[in-house]
């Protein structure tokens, strides 16, 4: 539920997503991404998700995404522009970093909000400053969540309105295999190691 808490804090508290907005969730197969898809949908947003395989695209759609893009086969910036009629999205949930940063900023509509909580692929990102001020964009950092938010998330999970996604549970002795699955991006949601 920590990934779900992180996604909740990003979308609800920091980006303040509203019903009717367009939200782009990067890496929907991650713990934060799979939770963000559900939270954005629960908030009444139209959700566009990215994922790295056709299987993950299907799983993102099953979680509630309205559109899902296989970023290994299609340019997600071009696809977002096509889906939104060149307008862009109101909110980008960014936690990948260097590999996606420039395109993530490019996906934003005028006045859009990019909320970031991680840098899986690196912490350096090129930003077109003209685009930042001309489109009046908002770049928002997000870290963790509050006890009150955790209580809200746990209630939504208990009520079945949010579902933390667990790909598989493995014995601790298989930690090396679990690490390999993470590095090769062969999971959807969280991997759990049991002692």
Task: Give short role names for the model-derived ranges.
Residues 1-74:
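Mid-domain Rossmann-like dinucleotide-binding core that forms the NAD(H)/NADP(H) cofactor-binding site
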Residues 7, 175-178:
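Non-catalytic, hydrophobic alpha-helical segments
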Residues 19-21, 89, 111:
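Phosphate-coordination loops involved in phosphoryl transfer and adenosine-cofactor binding
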Residues 24, 92-93:
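N-terminal Rossmann-like NAD(P) cofactor-binding module of classical short-chain dehydrogenase/reductase
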Residues 43, 51-54, 60, 95-165, ...:
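Glycine-rich phosphate-binding loop and adjacent beta-alpha segment
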Residues 76-86:
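Short amphipathic alpha-helix with an adjacent loop that forms part of the alpha/beta core around
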Residues 86, 161-165, 177-195:
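C-terminal capping/lid region of NAD(P)-dependent oxidoreductase domains
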